[in-house]
């Protein structure tokens, strides 16, 4: 899978883009 905003800081999955989830404060 590809995540266009990997490593971006986040507090919840919705802070990331499609196919991304928030893991340990970063999108992945």
Curated annotation (Swiss-Prot):
Compartments reported by the entry: Secreted
UniProt xrefs under Pfam families: Squash
GO cellular component, one term: extracellular region
Intrachain S-S bonds: 3-20, 10-22, 16-27
Primary subcellular site in the record, as a coarse category: secreted
Keywords: Disulfide bond, Knottin, Protease inhibitor, Secreted, Serine protease inhibitor
Entry-linked InterPro entries: Prot_inh_squash (IPR000737), Proteinase_amylase_inhib_sf (IPR011052)
Family: Belongs to the protease inhibitor I7 (squash-type serine protease inhibitor) family.
Record protein name field: Trypsin inhibitor A
């Amino acid at each position: 899978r590809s995540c266009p905003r990997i490593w971006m800081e986040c507090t919840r999955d919705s802070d990331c883009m499609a196919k991304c989830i928030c893991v340990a404060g970063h999108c992945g």
